[in-house]
Amino acid sequence: MEKDKISNFKNYKSDDQIKQLYKNVFGHNNNIIITKLSGGMKNSVYLVDESGKKVVLKIAPKDESKMISADRNILWWENEMLKLMETINFPSPNPLHYDESGNLCESPYLFMSYIPGVNYLENKNSLDNSIINNIEYEIGELSSRISSIRKEAFFLPSYPKKKFKNNYEFVTFLFELLLNDALSVNLDLGKDNYKIIKDILINYKNSLNNISNLSLTHTDIWDGNILINNNRVSGIVDFSDLYYCDELMCFYFHTIDGKTSEYFLKGYGKCNLNKDEQIRIEIYRMYVILKMIVDCKLKNYGRFAWMYDNFDTRIKTLTKIR
């Protein structure tokens, strides 16, 4: 993905502007070093270092019209989720200051603590399989810790007042948002695929509704949001995509490579998946790759053939299941 296209979407600030935000929160801005961090598809992120004391600043986009609907106006939710993670001793940043007033910045921003470590995605290919297996086991344990938080109602942070009777309604709404976003930019998903997706959801309504745990679920613990240190998980970053939903919406259940790590399953404590669970996982895989395709189209990042090939594979897999 071209970096300049991503930069055009993100709400980047000058060093002087960041110093003003920092001073407003911490009372001074002496001797700070500001580093723009890469990665992510939504927010601009900076590392601010004051004589070795590091904090991270995240700034939401000022124009969210090019974001998929489910990702709009959710930095407030990340702040709330980081507060919640503190109560379960989760390796996440601690929220330090959240501001959505618009006084110093036209969009919401969040200061949080810094977690040492290197990006797992960027270093995974250099790790031995045994280390990767151990990390995936840890990811399972951590994902399960979040999902231990239960609730009786579904919740989508971008639509906090929306009510859902069951998982079929919840998942169908997510797909409807995506498909409407796709239609708004005349996205070509292939012959009849708009209708096929809706038919798949209807066909598997019973499987979608056969859920045992409605829990807080981190839908975006993918390798790019994982930090490692000394071959262990040191932290998870990005907490805007947590929903109260089916626990199988946790990302590592439905990674887009079409596989579910056995070590993740062991760490999560769910080694056996019944047929309905396998079907839901495939539906969630389809959702994730469709989300990536629509996101790239909305932001004019380009068309990536591998995404469309993956999407076609997900469609074929779901139409073959009996």
Question: For each predicted feature, which ranges?
Answer:
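ATP-binding pocket architecture of kinase catalytic cores
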Residues: 35-170, 187
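ATP/Mg2+ or Mg2+-diphosphate-binding catalytic cores
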Residues: 6-8, 292-322
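Conserved catalytic motifs of the protein kinase core domain
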Residues: 52, 107, 212-214, 232
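Active-site Asp-x-Gly
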Residues: 214-217, 222-282
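An alpha-helical support segment within catalytic cores of ATP-dependent transferases
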Residues: 13-29, 131-137, 144-218, 266-269, ...
